[in-house]
């Protein structure tokens, strides 16, 4: 199979996107329907489609709204987006308008080689497949369906054979934190370009008791940093902006004198580049990221389910740029507690979704972070 041709212009450089105007990434939950019953599902997915979902005509108009924002990267997700028969029309319309499109299907009977090929021909640039364990015992327990692990491997193999760039997603919880090294080996073996590591936020079916501790977050961040130095794939994190702080700290340790090289925040993490100073530009809920639900509600992210509007009533660009919720989330001066006092608040800012899920206030301290800002004298989190 030949590599996929370049259909659209290259993604913009991370620093060239004004997050006050355009998100770097927009995720769109086109349906909540899914055949799986994942224990940590953000969407609390259901077996049948919701009759309130955006119609095919509304869906195409939403694509036009997204294009008018400045062409962020579009992630088509669910539930299982393959449960929508018009998903290929949505992808084709988005790709034809110049958007880079990622698809996040569930590894079910719908993820046939034929359907994956249809997505590729419609214009998908990347495929995201979840793997939450290195073996059936761990993964299938997560997914709630026996045989899901084997099906996941089959889908990944089909994606690779079709020449579609593969991103593997893993949700970190107390059930699989010890399995991460083995999962990383699987990620390499399937030829993934990116490993996206999500740190559980208590929303949907995800429970606070399933989360790893703050110290386990920190230890995992340092392990991921070490892994990223040698892995054949890029490492990215979701709902873990404090990983950026760890990367900066570890980079400073490795380059104590600077040597004329500064850290640069990019979509894939931190890279090095001569003569370019860092900016306070870190993607977070509502800051460089936007989420549209299956019924058109506009959220800062799928894990911070506080609606700022609906695409049926307002253009998504208007809500993202001007709503009180989104503008507050992009203002680090409004952060509270340790996050508000932290010298890394611009590039990190803590997970606003986790702060909301654990404290009820999306501007409060992210309780999963152990770091004590220089200006704060209290001890680290437990």
Model-derived features: positions:
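Short Fe-S-cluster ligation motifs
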Residues: 65-78, 365-382
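Residues embedded in well-ordered beta-strands within globular domains across many folds
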Residues: 75, 128, 196, 236-239, ...
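Generic alpha-helical structural signal
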Residues: 60, 88, 150-153, 181, ...
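Conserved alpha-helical substructure of the radical SAM core
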Residues: 2-126
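Residues at alpha-helix caps and immediate loop-helix transition turns in enzyme cores, especially N-
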Residues: 58, 86-87, 115, 179-183, ...
